[in-house]
């Protein structure tokens, strides 16, 4: 049975913290014409070429050795999913901690949702991000990285829109009518952002949103897939 974690995330710990390796890979989904730029964090023994990644005005970065060789086998696999106008750095504070504790972590810039690409119209076409996650999992498990991860221990962690994606992987559906009724009743900033885009969604696109679950059979078939939706601490 699929295990789902929604309320909290309990990080595992190890006797000693590992050094972090980081790699960059681009995965092209030719069927959907989507290029997904990824960063992979993982435990390594290499520290000689460490540099600082993902530092900004709000958060300290983390030290990692670029293109270092991963160490260990059967590491839990974590897929991090950013929110609207976010990017791979947003959850790097968490990804780096997980990697230090022995996890293999994949963070990505999800096209049409990421910094510089997201618009109200593109974000409402929310069925693509869950498909991106499913595609990424397949790519990792069929790559050279597969030797380092436990295919039966996979967790998806999402923030904001990424939180919806994690829930969608569990079968959640976006209720457009309910959202429009909410916006009619309350003066929410998100309603202003999406108002025109909601009105312009075609009937086919509305059906795509309501049927997101049917596009995720690959993820649903993974009995150990865990899903975490978060709504706190983000940086751009």
Spell out what each predicted region is:
Residues 13-16:
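N-terminal signal peptide c-region/cleavage motif recognized by signal peptidases
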Residues 19-78:
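Domain-level recognition of soluble alpha/beta enzyme cores
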Residues 70-74, 86-109:
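Short amphipathic alpha-helix adjacent to the substrate-entry channel of hydrolases
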Residues 76-83, 232:
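The conserved beta1-alpha1 loop
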Residues 85-97, 114-135, 147:
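Catalytic nucleophile-loop/oxyanion-hole region of alpha/beta-hydrolase
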Residues 122-147, 151, 168, 173, ...:
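Alpha/beta-hydrolase active-site loop
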Residues 153-155, 227-229:
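Residue in the alpha/beta-hydrolase core beta-strand immediately N-terminal to the catalytic nucleophile
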Residues 158-162, 166:
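Gly/Ala-rich beta-loop-alpha elbow adjacent to hydrolase catalytic centers
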